[in-house]
A protein has these predicted regions:
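A cross-family kinase active-site recognition segment
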Residues: 109-171, 194
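ATP-binding pocket architecture of kinase catalytic cores
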Residues: 32-137
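Protein kinase glycine-rich loop
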Residues: 17-20
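Juxta-kinase regulatory segment immediately upstream of eukaryotic protein kinase catalytic domains
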Residues: 1-13
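ATP/Mg2+ or Mg2+-diphosphate-binding catalytic cores
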Residues: 280-309
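All-alpha amphipathic helical-bundle segments outside canonical DNA-binding/catalytic cores
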Residues: 117, 262-272
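Active-site activation/catalytic loop segments of kinase-like enzymes and analogous catalytic loops
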Residues: 228-260, 274-290
Length: 309
């Protein structure tokens, strides 16, 4: 908390509470004018200053275009990024009102009809995100990590070598290797013709806020350059066990297709890429005895069965 208080001082802010602790530690702070803001202490060495500044530029440009996303807030010195140590940075974003549409690992709220409406709205929001992004002209310094074939299934994937997870059984490891081979072929061929550009890359329930009838999108800290369909696949990844999953998938695709085309089969492949990447993500971030390991491996196995048969 002391580190957060020191960082908050760059905005003359007062720390109220810890909100989340994943790639970033996120705190709610109060600003001198009475507004709330989200203070992010970025995970050291996960993203360098140039990447974080690019993410902040993108969010600011999207907000200016009318997208419901957080607005980066300058420090009292006028900078959007504040250094709190070697390779360790802080940033602050405008407060987004509302609540998450759900939480991973729990049943999605609402009846099937309400869930379908929600996913159609998420599809429309993601299409708008991609459409508005394509109208922007990034500065020469704009740089984001690549969510491409190498980023998912290369020798050093962005989130780790999922196929080397120490808790995989021999049968699971074999299926993971099959899935990796499938993705290598599918994504490598798709890279030359797929819709590729800046993506949010973490469209989980926790990152989609609802306030009344409106949706907002938060937490761009995994954003990168990649397959646009990955945003759709990620939005589906927490819902594979939902009874209405086929209808949710179709509603998401239909909502997106109202203003932007997609490739449903590629979306399914990218859904698989996300489920596998999440297994790799846990290897270095969770304790070996954390039950989430088995849950995420089981989910990846379910997704492999759905996509590969």
């Amino acid at each position: 908390m002391i580190q957060a208080e020191t960082a908050a001082a760059a905005w003359d802010g007062r720390v109220l509470r810890l909100l989340a602790e994943r790639e970033n530690r996120v705190f709610q702070i109060a600003l001198p004018d009475g507004r709330f803001a989200a203070l992010r202490l970025h995970r050291p060495s996960y993203r360098d200053a140039g990447v974080i500044r690019s993410e902040l530029w993108w969010c600011a440009a999207l907000a200016e275009a009318g997208l419901p996303v957080p607005v980066p807030l300058p420090t009292k010195n006028g900078d959007l990024l504040h250094s709190i140590g070697p390779d360790h940075h802080a940033s602050a974003l405008s407060w987004i009102e509302g609540i998450p549409v759900g939480k991973g690992g729990t049943a999605l709220a609402g009846d099937a009809e309400a869930q379908v409406r929600l996913f159609a709205a998420i599809g429309r929001l993601l299409a708008r995100l991609h459409n508005e992004t394509d109208r922007l002209t990034p500065p020469p310094t704009f740089t984001l990590p690549r969510w491409d074939a190498a980023g998912f299934i290369g020798r050093a994937p962005r989130w780790g070598r999922f196929w080397d997870h120490p808790q995989l059984s021999p049968a699971e490891a074999a299926r993971f290797h099959d899935a990796r081979a499938f993705l290598r072929d599918r994504l490598s061929h798709a890279e030359s013709q797929a819709d590729i550009g800046p993506i949010h890359a973490d469209v989980l329930r926790e990152n989609v806020f609802v306030n009344g009838g409106s949706l907002s999108l938060i937490d761009f800290d995994d954003s990168g350059i990649g397959f646009r369909g990955y945003d759709l696949g990620t939005a589906l990844s927490q819902n594979l066990y939902e009874p209405a999953y086929p209808a949710l998938r179709q509603a998401l695709l239909d909502g997106y297709a109202e203003t932007r085309p997609s490739d449903p089969e590629l979306v399914d492949a990218l859904l698989l890429a996300r489920c596998l990447a999440s297994v790799g993500w846990m290897i270095t971030r969770l304790a070996p005895d954390d039950p989430a390991h088995s849950r995420f491996i089981d989910r990846a196995m379910l997704c492999i069965a759905q996509v590969l048969g």
